[in-house]
Design a protein with these regions (language model features):
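FAD-dependent oxidoreductase catalytic-site/capping-region signature
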Residues: 22-26, 39-232
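Asparagine-centered polar/low-complexity signal
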Residues: 9, 232-234
């Protein structure tokens, strides 16, 4: 039974992170003698009182905003983190820092998910095709410039140190290249088994999540969303 929409229409929030170092005495998570001591004391506080530093989500604040006044609803999201975040924390750094994520909430780019083999233990081929639509890049450049203006404002002057990956916010070409080099998933994939009417050739399930043309089979996860929502899926 052929359903051409299976594995098509992949959408995800494309995410760009900028980070700055901060002194170790700040309320941030980091790899330093002082930071290790802070965590050790915080663990005891948590065990005794269920309070303190380790109750933090680390992603401590967020914001939704519009890239232009004429945009009807927010199209960019910021998430602030009290730690250095580099390549989803796969790249570790000594010291302390703060980071800010910016996401395109309603991306135009569409990717695919395919299979390599009939063996279910073989990993699938996932191609998000991030930034394949230039509108996403242009919007993320605006978001990157906004996040940089916020973190480089006077409110952070007393704690902000060096930028982990320096880029001039006013240099649009440099910001675009930095985004191409480092932007990645925010882990909100949807769309590869989209819900839709029979008239939609890429629809995989109906309004009751039943797979079209196959009796007794339903899909009940975020892959049935036809489009990505303007916020976290989890």
């Amino acid at each position: 039974h052929a359903l051409p929409g299976v594995g098509q229409n992949l959408q995800d929030h494309i995410d760009y992170v900028q980070s700055w170092t901060v002194p170790s005495h700040t309320a941030s998570f980091g790899a330093s003698p002082r930071g290790i001591g802070q965590i050790a004391r915080a663990m005891f506080e948590w065990r005794r009182q269920r309070s303190g530093m380790v109750t933090s989500t680390i992603a401590t604040a967020g914001a939704f905003f519009r890239s232009a006044p004429e945009v009807a609803v927010p199209d960019l999201q910021l998430v602030f983190v009290v730690a250095l975040v580099d390549d989803h924390a796969r790249k570790a750094h000594l010291g302390h820092g703060i980071s800010c994520h910016v996401d395109v909430l309603r991306p135009y780019s569409r990717g695919t998910v395919g299979i390599r083999s009939s063996n279910p233990r073989v990993a699938p081929v996932i191609d998000p095709q991030f930034l394949s639509d230039e509108r996403d890049l242009a919007l993320l450049v605006q978001g990157g410039q906004m996040q940089q203006r916020i973190l480089e404002s006077a409110a952070f002057d007393s704690v902000r140190g060096k930028m982990l990956y320096p880029v001039k916010s006013g240099d649009t070409a440099a910001m675009a290249q930095a985004i191409r080099n480092r932007a990645d998933t925010q882990y909100h994939p949807v769309g590869t088994c989209k819900m839709g009417p029979d008239s939609d050739p890429l629809a995989v399930v109906d309004a009751q999540l039943r797979v079209k043309g196959i009796a007794g089979l339903r899909v009940a996860d975020a892959s049935i969303m036809p489009t990505l929502i303007g916020g976290n899926t989890n």
